[in-house]
């Protein structure tokens, strides 16, 4: 018999990501001034202390009330989807846990300081990507995993229809 929910795994992932996110942000905020930067991998990765009071790329800068409301709605929706749509599906539960942790990590920053600490500064194929953090990475990986899970589910349904 398959497990319906992988609660322990899901909580462990979410707690690890939130703690890792918050610890790294704390280290950056307490040891570097905004704008300070150092190179980790030449021409590819820097650690740069940055603050963002908006979303990705500074979109909706200063709209904290909006972010509070939308984040609470998203967190509740993720719990709902975890319970309703991710039954027996460890892959989907991991994806939702990563999304939850990423949203919560940035939400904690917004509540405590009114802005998000960003510090991962990459240059990918000559494009200076916007500075981000562990929570943002968790959100991105979670979205990618959800897309993979949905594509796989769609593919499996088509295979069953053919048979």
From Swiss-Prot:
Changing residue 54 to P: Loss of activity. Residues 1-6, 84-89, 152-163 are cytoplasmic. Pfam families: Peptidase_A8 (PF01252). GO terms for cellular component: plasma membrane. Its main location: membrane. Disruption phenotype: Mutant in strain LAC grows similarly to wild-type in rich laboratory media, but has a reduced ability to survive in whole human blood. PROSITE patterns: SPASE_II. The active site is at residues 118, 136. LspA is an ideal target for anti-infective agents as it is required for the survival of MRSA under physiologically relevant conditions in human blood. Changing residue 52 to A: Retains 7% of wild-type activity. Inhibited by the antibiotics globomycin and myxovirescin. They act by blocking the catalytic dyad. Residues 26-62, 113-133 are extracellular. Keywords: Aspartyl protease, Cell membrane, Hydrolase, Membrane, Protease, Transmembrane, Transmembrane helix. GO terms for biological process: proteolysis. Its EC number is 3.4.23.36. InterPro entries: Peptidase_A8. It catalyses: Release of signal peptides from bacterial membrane prolipoproteins. Hydrolyzes -Xaa-Yaa-Zaa-|-(S,diacylglyceryl)Cys-, in which Xaa is hydrophobic (preferably Leu), and Yaa (Ala or Ser) and Zaa (Gly or Ala) have small, neutral side chains. Pathway: Protein modification; lipoprotein biosynthesis (signal peptide cleavage). Belongs to the peptidase A8 family. This protein specifically catalyzes the removal of signal peptides from prolipoproteins. This is Lipoprotein signal peptidase. The lineage of its organism: Bacteria, Bacillati, Bacillota, Bacilli, Bacillales.
């Amino acid at each position: 018999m398959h497990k319906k929910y992988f609660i322990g795994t899901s909580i462990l992932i979410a707690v690890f990501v939130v703690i890792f996110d918050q610890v790294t942000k704390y280290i950056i905020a307490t040891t570097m001034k905004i704008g300070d930067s150092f190179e980790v991998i030449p021409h590819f990765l820097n650690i740069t202390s940055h603050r963002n009071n908006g979303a990705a790329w500074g979109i909706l800068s200063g709209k904290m009330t909006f972010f509070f409301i939308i984040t609470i709605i998203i967190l509740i929706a993720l719990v709902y989807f975890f319970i309703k749509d991710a039954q027996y599906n460890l892959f989907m539960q991991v994806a939702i846990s990563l999304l939850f942790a990423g949203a919560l990590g940035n939400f904690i920053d917004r509540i405590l300081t009114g802005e998000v600490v960003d510090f991962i500064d990459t240059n990918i194929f000559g494009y200076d990507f916007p500075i981000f953090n562990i929570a943002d990475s968790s959100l991105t990986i979670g979205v990618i995993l959800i897309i993979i899970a949905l594509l796989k589910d769609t593919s499996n349904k088509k295979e069953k229809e053919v048979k």
